[in-house]
Structure formats: C-alpha cells, structure tokens
Amino acid sequence: MSFIEVKHINKTFKVPLKSKGRFSTLKTFFNRKYRYINAIQDVSFSIKKGEIVGYIGPNGAGKSTTIKILSGILVPDSGNVVIDHMTPWKDRKKYVSEIGVVFGQRSQLWWDIPAIDSFNLLKDIYKIDDNEYKKNLNELIELLNLKDIINIPVRQLSLGNRMKCEIAAALIHKPKILFLDEPTIGLDAVSKKIVRNFIKKINKLNKVTVILTTHDMSDIEALAKRIILIGKGKILYDGTLSKLKKEYDYIRKISIITKDKLELNNEYIVSQNKIENGLEFKIDIRKIEINEFIKLISSKISIIDIDIDSGNIDELIVKLYEDFKI
C-alpha cells in the first residue's frame, strides 16, 4: 500500500450571492441565494514513502484545497484519504504530530522573539523528549547553517534566513511528511539554492515525503521527479517531469562549434543551420536521445565545443495550461 492514498475526493464550497440595489442587505437576509464552487472533483492519486512530488496548477485550480484536506484542516464532501494508516481529519491529534507545514507567505515563528524561543515552544507543543529535541535541533542548525541567526529576533532576519528558520520549525519534531507551499517565494538565487539543497538532504537522510506546491517551476525542476497537475479541480496529468518534457517540449536546439561541414537528412532533424563558427541543429527528442545524437555527430565531425538548450520549464507549463484550457 502507498504511504499516501487519495481516493475520489470532492469538495464544494457554498458561496452567498450579493444582491444589488437599495435594501440589498435586507433582501439578502430574508432571501439569501448561493452559488456552488467545485473546488476539487474526483481527485485520486497515491504517493510512496520518501517521494518528492510537485503539485502544480494555476491559481484557483484546487491546490490549496487539496493540501488543506491532506493536512486535516478541511474534510472532503466525499472520498477518502489514508496517510500512514491514518485519516487526517479523524486521527487529527496523532496525525498532526507526523506532518510539517511551511507556507511561504505565512509564519509559524513569533515575530518579536528569537527563532530559538519558537523552537523551544514547539518542543513543548509536540512533547519532544529533551535528548531527541537537542539532537534534532543540532542537526537542523548544522544542515541549515542557523548557528549565527537563531538568537536574533525573527523580525530582524532577512527573508532567506527567516525561511530557513521556518523550515527548521516545521521539521523540529521529525515529521514523516512535509507540505511546502511556495517555500522559496521572494528569495534570492543563493537562498533558493540553500533551501532546495536542504530539502534534498532531509529527503535523502530521513526519507521525508515531500509535497511541493509552487508557481516557481525552477523549484519543481530542481526537486521533483514527479508532478501532479491540477486544473479546474481535476487531475490532468500525473507522471514524471522527463516524460512531460518528451510529450510537450520535445524540440531541442544543439549548437556545435566546429570547423567541419555536415548535413543530415534523418527523420529526427527538425532543422539545421550554419552559424558563426559551427552548426545548429534542432532535433526531436521523441525520435532520438540527445546523448545518442551527440555520439552520432562526434563520429562524423570534430567537435570543439557544444551547447544544449535544455528547454524552458516555465514555457512548458504555460503550453500545458493552454493545451488543457485551464
């Protein structure tokens, strides 16, 4: 059985309609009308222990509703969720001790006190043994390089350092599952790299299962091999990022610096042009692997240098949204 099993969950929100004109508030009071929003519809997926999964989609797609159900905040109208033999909203007390949540735009740290004081409070909330807490804290301090910042009031920390402390707070009780919502929002390139490397480390060291929701596709590319795409409340794609690229982003540009001449007429060649100091090929990677193509070229000409355009993940996702009309 999978570590996370989501089966046919649905959630509809009832939203009151506002009347227009004079006495609209009074009219609404006596004759209130509603509209119904299907936030998620028949959503099903499973996740293995230790997986990092990117859960993506445009605004209003149903990502947040799904995460709130998985974290036990919301109860679905129908369907079921089993995570590590627990149902989030039924086994809430036990379940919340096994999950960590990081929201990029919301803080679980107390603003006016040092992060270490928040960590100490979380120790009591989660009832962590003194020795275990000390071990966990030292590990997080070392991995995230927190030694010089945990005694500074949170409001005085840079956004990057604050986010590192947020992640430490979410992991202080050694959760089995980590929900990350926009964990690198607003961070500079260096801070993003630190956060991503840390997520990889704790996933590898502790087999923490990670569900990542973000609009920053570079996070997805750096961390997740598998993505689940949701749009208009429905799962539209569930598979590997590499497979998605092959299906929707299959043209690759390869620029070769060489003094030799070459012309190919194979079915995988989309176009070929002479450029300054060399040749430029556009190939269809559904028909030939890049490594295989380079091996072939190397056997025919002398290569001085080579540049491979790996494609733009943001453009790929935009194209995906357009194809699915979401």
Question: Where is each model-derived feature located?
Answer:
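Conserved ABC ATPase "signature" region
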Residues: 23-28, 120, 124, 132-149
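Conserved ABC transporter NBD signature motif
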Residues: 79-90, 94-95
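Conserved catalytic motifs of ABC-family nucleotide-binding domains
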Residues: 174
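Catalytic Walker B motif of ABC-type/P-loop ATPase nucleotide-binding domains
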Residues: 178-182
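ABC transporter nucleotide-binding domain
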Residues: 196-284
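Short, charged/small-residue-rich alpha-helical element at the C-terminal edge
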Residues: 252-326
